[in-house]
Regions:
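Short S/T/G/P-rich N-terminal loop/turn motif that feeds into the first structured element of a domain
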Residues: 1-66, 70, 78-94
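Metal-dependent phosphoesterase signature
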Residues: 73
Length: 94
């Protein structure tokens, strides 16, 4: 399984989350299998989303899409988001 971690400055969380929720079908169609949303404990305007993805290639295509870029601008994301492509190596019990 591949993962995509996006780190972005989202500004007003509720506004951003509304746009995020409306983008669900696009994420699914692009290969996303779901996500977990985190907020930086030291900076509530910094949000991190960890997506589970079919494969890294699909995740890369998603991050390069004009649709994602437009939705990020509309939702209030400021600055350039950071994208990290991850492969799970091992899962431990603790």
């Amino acid at each position: 399984m591949s993962y995509l971690l996006i780190k972005a400055k989202t500004g007003e969380y509720n506004k951003w989350k509304s746009f995020y929720d409306k983008h669900l079908e696009m994420r699914k169609a692009s290969g996303s299998k779901g996500s977990r949303i985190f907020r930086n404990a030291s900076d509530p305007n910094e949000t991190m989303i960890l997506f589970e993805w079919n494969n890294t290639e699909s995740a890369r295509k998603f991050t390069q899409s004009d649709d994602l870029r437009l939705k990020m601008q509309e939702s209030g994301v400021t600055g350039k988001p950071d994208f990290f492509f991850l492969d799970e190596i091992e899962k431990t019990s603790a």
